[in-house]
């Protein structure tokens, strides 16, 4: 299993191959299993910002539900100012 830092780096660099988002889903699971997902919150919002009109074939919903278990409001605000996204707007409406 990778370190938290390695997982976050992979999330930051992630690009779907031929529409396949499964590796991102695995990385999200690994990040939560490490027990301190808060350290990767900027990279998680970064996924929303890089793919602002996408839902990652459902993977973004896993990210959204995970983020909602954290202290995320300030990061959401910054993300929406930086690059508004479909998932960010959904999160704002859910507050």
Identify the function of each model-found stretch:
Residues 43-73:
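Short hydrophobic interaction/assembly module
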Residues 13-17, 46-54, 81-87:
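Solenoid-like repeat scaffolds
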Residues 1-27:
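Long, low-complexity, highly charged intrinsically disordered regions
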Residues 12-14, 24-29, 59, 74, ...:
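Extended interaction regions within the primary functional domain
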């Amino acid at each position: 299993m990778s370190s938290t830092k390695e997982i976050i780096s992979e999330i930051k660099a992630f690009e779907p191959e031929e529409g396949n988002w499964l590796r991102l889903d695995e990385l999200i699971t690994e990040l939560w299993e490490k027990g301190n997902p808060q350290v990767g919150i900027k990279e998680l919002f970064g996924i929303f910002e890089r793919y602002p009109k996408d839902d990652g074939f459902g993977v973004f919903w896993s990210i959204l539900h995970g983020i909602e278990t954290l202290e995320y409001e300030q990061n959401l605000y910054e993300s929406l100012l930086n690059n508004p996204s479909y998932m960010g707007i959904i999160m704002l409406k859910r507050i």
